[in-house]
């Protein structure tokens, strides 16, 4: 409210006049009151509020107080807010009060304009500039971030589009061919054309493929029309059917084609890589690991898991050489085909025996007890049984034409190990003799019913096929035996390089993995003696394996057998240089076959078959590695420390003096001969000399002298921790039919009968020894 008022100056004491009769001033004047200091007016007549009321009563339109000297007057004025005045009351101080007082003091009259405004509250103060500045800064930051994100997405999208274009360019395209038209092979074994035998309509446009129409084949093997799937792939980068990402496929960098599939399969196998330590027979210092991968696992006939290990091979066999140890280069390939092997054997080789139903497999400790006779397998089953892993390649990759290529099939499972089309035999290989006509005589009936093939070195890791039974004939070779490696639960890298995978996995000093012994696990069965050689219609040259003789008070239950050559784990073995000389005793009346280090070959009139010991009329090739029956002729090299035992070397097998311990002159042995000496001078020859316990030695000598049947020959010390060993009484004999010349061993009492031709061989051998030993004669007895 603004008003023009006539100023009327009044003295403050004039307001203290209480005389009501005094004339009132004309209405419209403004009273100006200068308040003095409180110290000067100790007893004011009226308060500041009372003075304002007095002025209003006298007709003042407004009252102005100068509170420069008395600032407390504001509080006194605020006390009358409950009863406000009808006229405005204004207080002034500072420069405004000085100016006003100057005007009042110098002029008689003046005009004043009073403008009323409400007081400002402190909360109402707000600076819009600060807010605007802050808002602008935040907006700029957000805008910059959005721009950067957008640019990054655009660059990523451009990169993905470029990668999609590149992946699309590298994808193969094929032309659709109608049914009946010939399709040609692609570079990787795939087809450049697609026939209508597969899905013949596009999953995008739902139209059928037309002959000659170009189709896009995605790496996931789904195919569509090129015009339909290309825009989708460029935009979404995935297969419309299975959502396979083509960009991720490109990032893998494997490339299209068959090599990509094989490499992806190799990466899956790499996750379960197994390193198998492999020792080769006769090569003491040359051993090396072989990398293999588990390909499949199945259950054996006894409920044990069998895992097939495949040896690592390069993707392109033509581009990469076979990973073969150099020291195997000297071994010649051996074909599995009878027609190409040059060996014609009329003996029958029955399949592996099936274990009785309901008999649980039990892994026993190796102490020679509870094992069965070595089954008389054919050489084609034996020599490839433990030396090859699936996919392992060996040198001499020669092609074999016709039906000779890869005919190693057992029960529908392919066991051949392709190195060219031949299988290669590490030497020396232990041959097994042929089976008899009676299936029972050579079948395995041990307590755990486990078919143990005693031949060569074998790592105690799963590396065989899962075939439950072996039924291949002699014309079919076996590259691996599932039953000789049934217990695959201990798939460790500790190798037991023995001849039977059921042996305990131990590399202690008791075991010498480079020593052979001529002892096959004995046959059990509660004295179930097989038929004699004449029973059952045995064929020509058939050899029958029976239970072995036993000796009283022997600490072990090992049975001595001539069926196979095994490793000795508890014998006194020695490693000798190839030039070392081993002594042997006089062995009369036996066929002789010795390969001297100097190259001289002394043999009898006829030789036995390398696999089944069938006599052959002709001279076999000098390049083959063979086994011979009968004792070794005497050599004038001095007496031996242990008798009746075998010594095995890479060049020659010796037989020690038979008169000291076992003491029987006509005891047979399996002689192994490798006509070709080793190519390496640093190779060691392995010799074996079995030592009997002192208590059992005398008993063994006495028993042999009497030729008592049913006594075990102690070879391996007693294993007290073994459980479940079966003791029985049996006898052993080797019988030949007709006019065949062969050794007949002791059956009942002192028999030791020899055929006429065998005695002739023994006499010819005695002439060659020329005074080396005396007192040993060939004993002739009547045949039963």
Curated annotation (Swiss-Prot):
Species in which this protein is naturally found: Xenopus laevis
GO molecular function: frizzled binding; ubiquitin protein ligase activity; ubiquitin-protein transferase activity; zinc ion binding
BP GO terms, sorted: limb development; negative regulation of canonical Wnt signaling pathway; negative regulation of non-canonical Wnt signaling pathway; protein ubiquitination; stem cell proliferation; ubiquitin-dependent protein catabolic process; Wnt receptor catabolic process; Wnt signaling pathway
Gene: znrf3
Side Cytoplasmic, residues: 150-784
EC number: 2.3.2.27
Subcellular location: Cell membrane
Functional note: E3 ubiquitin-protein ligase that acts as a negative regulator of the Wnt signaling pathway by mediating the ubiquitination and subsequent degradation of Wnt receptor complex components. Along with RSPO2 and RNF43, constitutes a master switch that governs limb specification.
Entry-linked Gene3D superfamilies: 3.50.30.30, Zinc/RING finger domain, C3HC4 (zinc finger)
Family: Belongs to the ZNRF3 family.
Pathway(s) the chain acts in: Protein modification; protein ubiquitination
GO cellular component: plasma membrane
SMART domains in the cross-refs: RING (SM00184)
Domain of life: Eukaryota
Transmembrane segment boundaries: 129-149
Keywords: Cell membrane, Membrane, Metal-binding, Signal, Transferase, Transmembrane, Transmembrane helix, Ubl conjugation pathway, Wnt signaling pathway, Zinc, Zinc-finger
Record flagged with keyword Transmembrane: yes
Topology relative to the membrane: Single-pass type I membrane protein
Ranges annotated as RING-type zinc finger: 202-243
PANTHER family per record: RING ZINC FINGER (PTHR16200)
A Pfam match: zf-RING_2
InterPro entries: Znf_RING, Znf_RING/FYVE/PHD, ZNRF-3_ecto, ZNRF3_Arkadia_E3_ligases, ZNRF3_Znf_RING
Keyword Metal-binding: yes
Protein name: E3 ubiquitin-protein ligase ZNRF3
SUPFAM superfamilies per record: RING/U-box (SSF57850)
């Amino acid at each position: 409210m603004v008003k023009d008022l006539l100023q009327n100056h009044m003295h403050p004491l004039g307001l203290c006049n209480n005389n009501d009769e005094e004339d009132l001033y004309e209405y419209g004047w403004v009273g100006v009151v200068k308040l003095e200091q409180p110290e000067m007016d100790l007893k004011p007549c009226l308060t500041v509020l009372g003075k304002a009321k007095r002025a209003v009563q006298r007709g003042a339109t407004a009252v102005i107080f100068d509170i420069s000297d008395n600032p407390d007057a504001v509080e006194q004025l605020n006390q009358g807010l409950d009863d406000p005045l009808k006229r405005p009351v204004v207080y002034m101080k500072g420069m405004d009060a000085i100016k006003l007082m100057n005007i009042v003091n110098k002029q008689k009259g003046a005009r004043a304009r009073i403008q009323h405004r409400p007081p400002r509250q402190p909360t109402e103060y707000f600076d819009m500039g600060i807010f605007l500045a802050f808002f602008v800064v935040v907006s700029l930051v957000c805008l910059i971030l959005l721009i950067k994100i957008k640019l990054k997405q655009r660059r990523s999208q451009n990169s993905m589009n470029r990668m999609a274009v590149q992946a699309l360019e590298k994808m193969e395209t094929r032309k659709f061919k109608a049914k009946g038209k010939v399709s040609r092979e692609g570079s990787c074994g795939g087809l450049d054309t697609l026939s209508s035998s597969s899905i013949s309509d596009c999953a995008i446009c739902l139209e059928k493929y037309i002959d000659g129409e170009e189709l896009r084949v995605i790496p996931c093997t789904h195919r569509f029309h090129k015009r339909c799937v290309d825009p989708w792939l460029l935009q979404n980068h995935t297969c419309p059917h299975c959502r396979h990402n083509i960009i991720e496929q490109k990032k893998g960098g494997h490339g299209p084609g068959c090599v990509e599939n094989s490499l992806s399969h190799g990466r899956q196998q790499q996750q379960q890589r197994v390193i198998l330590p492999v020792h080769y027979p006769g090569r003491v210092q040359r051993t090396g690991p072989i990398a293999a991968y588990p390909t499949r696992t199945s259950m054996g006939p006894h409920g044990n898991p069998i895992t097939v290990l495949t040896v690592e091979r390069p993707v392109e066999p033509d581009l990469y050489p076979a990973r073969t140890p150099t020291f195997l280069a000297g071994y010649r390939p051996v074909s599995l085909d009878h027609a190409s092997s040059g060996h014609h054997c009329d003996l029958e080789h029955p399949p592996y025996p099936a274990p009785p139903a309901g008999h649980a497999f039990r892994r026993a400790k190796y102490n020679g007890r509870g094992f069965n006779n070595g089954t008389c397998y054919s050489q084609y089953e034996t020599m490839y049984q433990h030396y090859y892993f699936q996919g392992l390649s060996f040198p001499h990759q020669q092609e074999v034409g016709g039906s000779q290529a890869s005919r190693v099939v057992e029960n529908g499972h392919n066991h051949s190990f392709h190195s060219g089309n031949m299988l290669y035999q590490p030497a020396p290989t232990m041959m097994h003799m042929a089976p008899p006509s009676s299936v029972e005589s050579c079948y395995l009936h041990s307590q755990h019913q486990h078919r143990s093939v005693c031949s060569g070195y074998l790592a105690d890791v799963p590396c065989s096929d899962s075939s439950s039974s072996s039924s291949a004939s002699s014309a079919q070779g076996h590259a691996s035996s599932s039953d000789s490696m049934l217990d695959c639960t201990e798939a460790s890298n500790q190798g037991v390089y023995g001849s039977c995978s059921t042996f305990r996995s131990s590399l202690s000093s008791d075991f010498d993995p480079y020593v052979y012994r001529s002892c096959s696990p004995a046959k059990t069965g509660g004295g179930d003696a097989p038929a004699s050689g004449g029973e059952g219609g045995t064929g020509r040259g058939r050899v029958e394996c029976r239970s072995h003789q036993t000796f009283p008070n022997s600490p072990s239950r090992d049975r001595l057998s001539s069926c196979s050559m095994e490793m000795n784990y508890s014998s006194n073995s020695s490693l000798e240089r190839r030039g070392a000389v081993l002594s042997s005793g006089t062995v009369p009346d036996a066929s002789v076959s010795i390969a001297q280090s100097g190259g001289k070959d002394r043999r009898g009139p006829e030789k036995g078959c390398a696999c089944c010991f069938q006599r052959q009329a002709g001279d076999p090739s000098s390049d083959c590695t063979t086994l011979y029956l009968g004792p070794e002729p005497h050599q004038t090299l001095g007496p031996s420390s242990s008798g009746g035992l075998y010594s095995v070397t890479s060049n020659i097998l010796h037989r020690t003096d038979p008169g000291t311990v076992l003491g029987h002159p006509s005891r047979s042995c399996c002689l192994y001969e490798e006509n070709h000496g080793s190519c390496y001078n640093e190779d060691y020859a392995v010799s074996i000399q079995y030592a009997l316990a002192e208590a059992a030695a005398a008993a063994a000598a006495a028993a042999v002298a009497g030729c008592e049947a049913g006594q075990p020959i102690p070879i391996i010390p007693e294993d007290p921790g073994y459980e479940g060993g079966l003791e029985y009484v049996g006898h052993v004999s080797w019988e030949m039919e007709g006019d065949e010349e062969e050794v007949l061993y002791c059956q009942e009492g002192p028999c030791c009968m020899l055929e006429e031709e065998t005695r002739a061989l023994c006499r010819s051998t005695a002439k060659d020894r020329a005074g080396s030993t005396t007192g040993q004669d060939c004993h002739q007895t009547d045949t039963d």
